[in-house]
Amino acid sequence: MKNWIVGMVALVTMVPVMAATPWQKITHPVAGSPQSIGGFANGCVIGAQPLPLESADYQVMRSDQRRYFGHPDLLNFIHRLSAQAHQQQLGTVLIGDMAMPAGGRFSSGHASHQSGLDVDIWLQLPKQRWSQQQLLKPQPIDLVAVDGKRVIPALWQPQIESLIKLAAKDNDVTRIFVNPAIKKQLCLDAGADRQWLHKVRPWFAHRAHMHVRLRCPANSLECVDQDTPPPGDGCGAELESWFQPPPPSAKPGKTLPPPLPPSCQALLDNHFATE
């Protein structure tokens, strides 16, 4: 577990310094029947749709970055979740990064979010809708204490757990990544209803948002799903291992991104050949 964590730290710290990618130059979705292609961290999407920026139930942050595209299944999930949150009077759901118009690799900020099936949702639920200025330059609330071992009690709200639980109980959701301290708090608060917790996975950072991932759509034949999370609530030894100091390791070297799935490479080639 520890060696795997150290390796993944190297990957996470590498992402922000990756070079610009051609995917950022594609400003509109690729026409075609919606298809998520490849893996979540090495893929693309055909027929992506933009999440409507106007909704009574949610607001989209940093829309100027044009990261609000996804497979229709992802848009449907966001509509379902935000409607449920509205019905339960949790507050306004704040939508962060989804995917770029054709998916693909980001130059910074994410290793995944490439196949149109990932969305970041902030773990704050304002009662008052944000202004356009707040949405363009949002200020996250760090819920995790400095020592990284617990949430800050004054910032933790029951509505946050309710939002995560609603997302985890959605049939299309396979994983929700949160900071280990947030997972720990969910384990403490869950009570007898714990089945949903196995989808909530501890991960680096994620101190102010949850990263929700959907299963591959049934008609996306080239989409690569992850293995199902292990059974159980994930609140035992695996979770505790995240709070142990990592062993010393050599400084990681630079690694090149893997080759694209052939269909994604063909998509890029065709797009730039017709420019």
Curated annotation (Swiss-Prot):
Biased composition (Pro residues): 244-262
Pfam families in UniProt: Peptidase_M74
GO biological process: peptidoglycan metabolic process; proteolysis
Descriptive protein name: Penicillin-insensitive murein endopeptidase
Highest classification ranks of the organism: Bacteria, Pseudomonadati, Pseudomonadota, Gammaproteobacteria, Enterobacterales
InterPro entries: Hedgehog_sig/DD-Pept_Zn-bd_sf, Peptidase_M74
Localisation per UniProt entry: Periplasm
One of the record's GO cellular component terms: outer membrane-bounded periplasmic space
Statement: the UniProt record of this protein carries the keyword Metal-binding: yes
EC class name: hydrolase
Annotated binding of Zn(2+) 1, by residue: 110, 113, 120, 211
Binding site for Zn(2+) 2: 147
Disulfide bonds: 44-264, 187-235, 216-223
Note on how the cofactor is bound: Binds 2 Zn(2+) ions per subunit. Zn(2+) ion 1 is bound in the active site. Zn(2+) ion 2 is bound at the dimer interface by residues from both subunits.
